Amino acid sequence: MESCDCFETHVNQDDLLVKYQYISDALIALAYFSIPLELIYFVQKSAFFPYKWVLMQFGAFIILCGATHFINLWMFFMHSKAVAIVMTIAKVSCAVVSCATALMLVHIIPDLLSVKNRELFLKKKADELDREMGLILTQEETGRHVRMLTHGIRRTLDRHTILRTTLVELGKTLCLEECALWMPSQSGLYLQLSHTLSHKIQVGSSVPINLPIINELFNSAQAMHIPHSCPLAKIGPPVGRYSPPEVVSVRVPLLHLSNFQGSDWSDLSGKGYAIMVLILPTDGARKWRDHELELVENVADQVAVALSHAAILEESMHARDQLMEQNFALDKARQEAEMAVHARNDFLAVMNHEMRTPMHAIISLSSLLLETELSPEQRVMIETILKSSNLVATLISDVLDLSRLEDGSLLLENEPFSLQAIFEEVISLIKPIASVKKLSTNLILSADLPTYAIGDEKRLMQTILNIMGNAVKFTKEGYISIIASIMKPESLQELPSPEFFPVLSDSHFYLCVQVKDTGCGIHTQDIPLLFTKFVQPRTGTQRNHSGGGLGLALCKRFVGLMGGYMWIESEGLEKGCTASFIIRLGICNGPSSSSGSMALHLAAKSQTRPWNW
């Protein structure tokens, strides 16, 4: 023992306290050694751990602490100096590591404590996401119900079926005790009960529209809670021993109901509202939730749109019925007009054959009788017969021509003719009649007037003769002159006529004919009457002349058919009158070698043409 470098213990090994300390050190060492093993195991199992180096340092600290307790087991017995040195090294190492760990924990512990805050934050976010998910699911459910209700509402376009379907579907979806719709009355002063779900109250009940609660509903687009005692909510069953159920009302815009016919619709033209009332069951267990109120608001909008579509459909059907009636009336009128046209044509055909043929015979015989020797009384009688026959023949011709103009069956003949010869022939026909009244006749043709033109020679001559005949008829003394010239392009543009649109071309020209007289004249305001059929203006002077009032009306139709325009000017009574017209004629550009043959053709034509004046 003297040569052994040992330390002797001063504790009584048989003491019970020493035994407890010995056992405690052994257990502490065992625990210290097991903790790092557990940490290493769980760190390896973890997918993510941000503080591995801290864990290694903490594990070293625990192992060294366990080593000190483990070495301390030998300190209870006699031990060598080496054991003491190992114990010292272990404690020094443990002290260094523990101090380093303590310093490191100063920075790590706040992060570890914030983990809890982050956990709470994440939990809060998770709760918010759950609420949002619940809201999304609720909105999807609301949308699904709205789509189902919309599909049920829009399956028909009958307004009563729409409202009935709405109440039934809302009652099923929301498990309602009662659901009703109040519509404005015709006067707009009351709301009338038009549709109910259970029919427990009579339809047709009314409440004044000026109630404060009704005005409040009209001014809000959202569903509103109303008291159970409100007149609108009297449709529900008796409450009894249960608490009053919750009642919600929402307005329904009447977008397009102005043309609805019926006692239960008012003429509001898109400015009124109906009110929908919804009542929950009377047991008081249910409350209105936000998504249910949103569902009610959406359904109210869909009902408004469906009613608008139904109104438009009814209006279109009503318009279609009216259009069918109008088409039927028009078809009937067309048939009657066709019958009238056929009757007129038949009449004209009969008149043309049965009246003009004997009239020509009378005119011919009267003319032959005037060439024989007659007494003055006989001559007056024959002249009267001839004059009346000519008048009747002229009226018949005018009526026939006017009828053909009106039905569009009269067509112009575009053939070359001698333009100057027409005016000379008119003068030769009018001059004997004018000489009887001692009237002078003048013919003035412009130097640039072409010799030949292309057009309807017969209608042009008929127009000039008609105007000249009127001039002779209404002129007692003085003169009658015809002026023919070509209208220049600048003169055509200066004509103040909204009815005449000249078209300039190298293939035609515009002929202007003026007939001036010194007759009785006419008031300016009476000039339009001259072109009215069967109308003769009556002025202050004596114009009691025979005629049917067709001549000038027929002339204006002929002029318009020839692409021209006709007008009359007069400065007043007893100041004469000037009748003017412009027509479009084609330019006749025949070769010079054939001018002789054209002249022969026109001469032969003038001898054989059947004039009916």
UniProtKB/Swiss-Prot annotation:
| Membrane topology recorded in Swiss-Prot or TrEMBL | Multi-pass membrane protein
Q: Where's the GAF domain?
A: 158-307
Q: How is it modified after translation?
A: Autophosphorylated on both His and Ser residues in the presence of manganese. Loss of His autophosphorylation in the presence of both manganese and magnesium.
Question: Could you tell me the keywords of this UniProt record?
Answer: ATP-binding, Copper, Disulfide bond, Endoplasmic reticulum, Ethylene signaling pathway, Kinase, Membrane, Metal-binding, Nucleotide-binding, Phosphoprotein, Receptor, Serine/threonine-protein kinase, Transferase, Transmembrane, Transmembrane helix, Two-component regulatory system
Pfam families on file: ETR1_N, GAF, HATPase_c, HisKA
One CC-aspect GO term: endoplasmic reticulum membrane
**Record's InterPro entries?**
GAF, GAF-like_dom_sf, HATPase_C_sf, His_kinase_dom, HisK_dim/P_dom, HisK_dim/P_sf, Sig_transdc_His_kin-like_C
Task: Quickly give the catalysed reaction.
Answer: ATP + protein L-histidine = ADP + protein N-phospho-L-histidine
What the record says about family reads: Belongs to the ethylene receptor family.
**Biological function:** Ethylene receptor related to bacterial two-component regulators. Acts as a redundant negative regulator of ethylene signaling.
Protein name from the UniProt record? Ethylene response sensor 1
- What does the record give as the organism's lineage? Eukaryota, Viridiplantae, Streptophyta, Embryophyta, Tracheophyta
